[in-house]
Amino acid sequence: VTAVSDDLWRPSSGCDEECLPAAGEVPTVPVPRRVLRLVAVAGMLLAGAGLAVLLPVLPAPERQAAVRGWARGTARAFGVRLVIRGRLPRRRALLVANHVSWLDILAVLAVAPTRMVAKREVRSWPVLGLLAAAAGTVFVDRSRPRALPATVRRVTDALRAGRPVAVFPEGTTWCAGDGAADCRPGGGFRPAMFQAAIDAGSPVVPLRLAYRCEVTGTATTAAAFLGADTLLRSMARVVAARELVVSVTIAAALHPARDADRRLLARAAESAVHLRPVAGAATRGRLHPVPTLTVVAPPASTPALTPDAGRELDLAA
């Protein structure tokens, strides 16, 4: 990995409070329902604290099942419905997703309990930070860009060892709404972590995360965590929202050649996530997209990375 500039892992978006829903824009649940959700969330946080202690001693299959179950249960406690479309490959892979909210972490872990790459600040988040550390999250110190090559090597080693890894290569959250071109983080998908997939010979699987309000049938930024917004304010919006749905769409895997350019690989993944052409996206000559398969019932030996069978899995809140 080449030397990096001081702003490589300090990306920023153009989002501000205007990107968040206006008062009354998103249907809400009554106050008693919000209180019940908060009680449920508190229960899941307590369970998560206990789980963080157990994770290091659990065998890998049980550890992955526990993390997946906790992530799904916590999303349900917040009143969020999770919809999963597609199926992950059976090989260990680098999972890359767009970044809108802190809920993205729960959504990804609910699909596949992978090792995450996250900013150092996540370590201080209540319970989620403890779980992240216990699950082997690779924390990125964005104030020390010269440490990035070592971080990429850690991700490469994890992939070579057969452990899937998930990363949000935009490096920051943004609204990703229609007409939000000015909000897009400068540089789009950062290419550094894609080098790990190339070096490890691992496929790259783009994940598309989208939030919508089932009541209105439209996309919403109610769950977004943007700009000067605080984690508590963002959580309060989620707890109050009526029928909030997060969908995780698993796109076709990209199989980079050994001599692939990480920048082109990043552009190709970004194009798959945002469903629009990105300047400089790689061609089939250097990347080999393989359509994802859908099965009715996987064999008993299906690796832990593979999520529940079926074209669409709807986990109702």
PLM features: what roles do these ranges have?
Residues 107-108, 131, 157, 195-197:
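Hydrophobic/aromatic ligand-binding patch that stacks against planar heteroaromatic rings
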Residues 127-129, 175-260:
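A cross-family acyltransferase "interaction/gating" segment
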Residues 1-24, 81-85, 179-192, 196, ...:
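Soluble, non-transmembrane catalytic domains of enzymes that act on hydrophobic metabolites at membranes
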Residues 22-83, 130-135:
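A transmembrane-helix-recognition feature enriched in membrane-embedded lipid enzymes
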Residues 46-60, 76-77, 93-145:
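Catalytic core of membrane glycerolipid acyltransferases/transacylases, capturing the structured
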Residues 92-94, 137, 162-168, 203, ...:
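Residue-level preference for the first positions of well-ordered beta-strands
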Residues 2-45, 215-224:
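Compositionally biased, charge-rich terminal segments
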Residues 237-317:
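Long, non-transmembrane cytosolic or organellar matrix-exposed soluble domains/tails
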